[in-house]
Amino acid sequence: MSFNTSMLIADIVGITGSFSTAYGAHTGIATLPLKYYGNEDQKKKFLTGLVSGELKGAYCLTEPNSGSDANSGKSKAILNSDKSKYIINGQKMWISNGGFADIYIVFAKIDDDKNLTAFIVEKSRDGITMNPEEDKLGIKGSSTRQIFFNDVEIPIENMLGEREGGFKIALNVLNIGRIKLGAGVLGGCRGIIDNAISYSLERIQFNVPISSFGAIKQKLAMMIVQTFSCESICYRAGDDIEKKISFFQKEGKSLNQSELEAIELFSVECAISKIY
């Protein structure tokens, strides 16, 4: 699947709100760390199930005191005495898909490391507990929960990527998530415009549809112009990324490496697509 095809899917499902949140968290930030950084054994054990939908994934980065400053997280991973397992302790919050996920991508620091390391943690492991679902203003059909890791033991084979490489994994995956969130919002905007136009045609005041009033026309026009601007930003950035992926592949780099380097190159555009 090309990058822009995945952008189009995010756009189409964006109107669904709750489903698009669950879908995006699973196929994006929960699955891509394994796609890009997992070894062959990890991909066979976990990625196959995530891709088929047999397993559901969640991404555990944010903590009560580390949001945008993600690398300041306090979650810890310590080797046990025979160095066969990591023991993870910590708290994660606002975890999309947290309630029903089977696999968690968890970020923690080993001993006194300065940077995070990524780990694959199965929900079935002992020591995992969670708070009730968050009482959100919207997207109530998606799961958002706090997750606690209390002496959770995982085999050393479940470390994802290199030691202290977790922060890099987190940022690269979030860059992809940002631009796809922008594409997802497009779908929501189009749905809102459709509903607004339909209502303006149905609502009658002074014996005419309110769509004939100048103020309503102006509001609808601004909605359309702003949505078109957002669309232009997202798909221009997506096309630039797609072209760079192709360029890097022609240089002999793998698809995964090409995608990562292209996303890194356009990380600012990814952030703009999300914020705008």
Language-model features, listed with the residues they occupy:
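Active-site beta-strand/loop segments that form the cofactor-binding cradle
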Residues: 1-26, 35, 52, 60-65, ...
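Short Gly/Pro-enriched turn/cap motifs at secondary-structure boundaries
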Residues: 65-68, 94-97, 109-110, 136-143
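Flexible, small-/acidic-enriched active-site or ligand-binding loops
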Residues: 72-74, 126-155
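Alpha-helical interface subdomain recognition
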Residues: 1-15, 37-38, 42, 53, ...
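Long, acidic (Asp/Glu-rich), low-complexity accessory segments flanking structured domains
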Residues: 151-169
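Short Ser/Thr-interspersed hydrophobic loop/turn segments at strand-loop and sheet-helix junctions
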Residues: 9-14, 108-110, 121-126, 150-154
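A short core secondary-structure module
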Residues: 85-130
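N-terminal glycine-rich flavin-associated loop
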Residues: 21-41, 67-70, 78-82
